[in-house]
Amino acid sequence: MSERSARRRNRESARRNDDREIMVLLTSKIMERTAVFVTVGGLVTTLVTTFIPLWKTLNSDLNEVENWYSGLWHTCVFTEEVGIQCKAFESLMGLPVDLLVSRILMLVSVGTGALAVVVAFPGLQGVDLGSGTRPRMKRGLLIVSGVLSWVSGLTSLAAVSLVAYVTVVEFWDENLPDVVPRWEYGEAMFSGWFSGLFLVIGGSLFFVAVCMADYDVEQTVARLPNTPQEKPRRQHYLKTEVL
């Protein structure tokens, strides 16, 4: 029995050491920094995706010299002789509905993503602004930042998916002759999907950091000696107990 109990104790101590090593590597502070890094990466990618004219590409077998590119704000044509020439859309009235809605969604994505980074900065551990920030307030700021990152990522995914859906529908339109060239996916489509995923992952990491911080607080409170000391019994109470 003594050998078995010793083995159990060794196993439990080894597990505790492994858990401690994992907690050292994965702390709430590191998770917060990782969330900010991923969110900033998604925000920068979303900002670039919003303004580059590479959402859709068009090239035909009849005219291989010209390559057309279309974005949310410009339409560009590339030729070997002249190079690339871009022209902005003249009016909102003549703009397709999918591009107009995608413009709004991408601007909302950029705005909420930037706000998420700004809100998360004072909520990070080790960042003290002014007279100090309470832990409960920091926790609330990180939660708000996570929600904003989620909104930013979902709006970016919705905008890119909308343009992708319309492009697929127009590509397989049976009413158009086979000779007519069709728009295809551009590089900005894929960068928009990746940026949306980064923002969603960044928001999720903010929630994970909050949960890890709450767990650390619970473990700290549980380790505190809060066992009340027994009051000394009176002499007459001891006598009645003996009787």
PLM regions and their residue ranges:
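Intrinsically disordered terminal tails
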Residues: 1-43, 48-64, 70, 128-138, ...
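Juxtamembrane membrane-interface segments at transmembrane-helix boundaries in membrane proteins
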Residues: 20-29, 83-104, 136-139, 175-190
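Alpha-helical transmembrane segments of multi-pass membrane proteins
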Residues: 35-47, 103-120, 139-167, 188-203
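Hydrophobic alpha-helical transmembrane segments
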Residues: 45-54, 89-100, 134-148
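A surface-exposed beta-alpha-beta supersecondary segment
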Residues: 52-103
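Amphipathic alpha-helical interface segments within eukaryotic helical scaffold
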Residues: 86-132
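Alpha-helical membrane-embedding segments
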Residues: 92-103, 167-170, 204-217
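Juxtamembrane loop segments immediately following a transmembrane helix
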Residues: 128-134, 157-190
